[in-house]
Amino acid sequence: KIVGESYPFNEKSHFLLLADNHNSVNGIRQFCLSKGGKVTYAPIYYQDLTIDENFLKEQLEDASEFDNKLLAFPAQSNVSGVKHDLDWIKKAQDLGWDVLLDAAAFVPTNRLDLKEIKPDFVSVSFYKIFGYPTGIGCLLVNKEKFKKLRKPWFAGGTVSLVSVNTIQHFLINNHERFEDGTLNYLDIPAIKIGLDYIENIGIKRINERVASLRKYVFERLENLKHENGQSLVQIFGPKNHQNLGGTIILAFYNKDGIRYEFEQIEEQANQFNISLRSGCFCNPGIDETNNCLTDNELATYYSSHQEGDYKDMIKFLGKMRGATRISVGIATNQNDINQLINFLETLLNQ
């Protein structure tokens, strides 16, 4: 939000995103649109869920008429676990783009070397790294781009001087101008404890553990077949599983090849005390791609509704939406995966 409201969008701006961005990043587009700027999404490939790099390259190169150009780039998909090529950051910057790197899904299990990769802005969520506290994030800003962010309002703790009679104010000339109100000083000390905990384990060890568990999950899932040969599980994402994080997106099918609704899988998993995430995971781009929702279908729905929700759209379109996501991370062990497989085996031959 800080980048969105403070970036100098205008009618000659271009905001470029991937269709694999989280809604926390997608929302920035409203700031650009409100100033008359252009918003473009680089698509991802169906089922493979990797970037259409030719499209992205064309958009980056064909932008000479724009003044302020911002690329929002996810280091890793929060849904599929796909790690996008970070070389695009420098490629974009060399063409005059500023780059906002969403590293929230990446840094819990990967090292982000900011001496090598130099985005202009980086967003991080601490609770996704070590589970606590929620509600405290981090925005890293390249010092050279700090003054480019023009905060449009102020609140307590962000100003050095305010006048009521002349309606003038001066913002604090450092990062405090973006820290509205009283900081959450009761929870902030937990961040140091969490970071020390991760450092003691070692991010390299965490990365290797997640890779090992991910490989084991894939092997077990791919062997789940009904007696007639129909696969129980469809795994979305690239065939090469090497460059993936710890999240895996799935769909499930009965013996006749009919897809289960994701709510049904989640409800049955709950009976086994297994917590699964289902829905669109705050990432509508992957959901729309995987479920083959066309631009015309989506435009028709939104133009005929003043409000709506997930279930209403499913009913209107007559198409399946959503999927199921499983995650492996620092707290996961092989027994957790075995319990998941034991549950899924109860769905076989049904």
Language model regions located:
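Pyridoxal 5′-phosphate
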Residues: 1-350
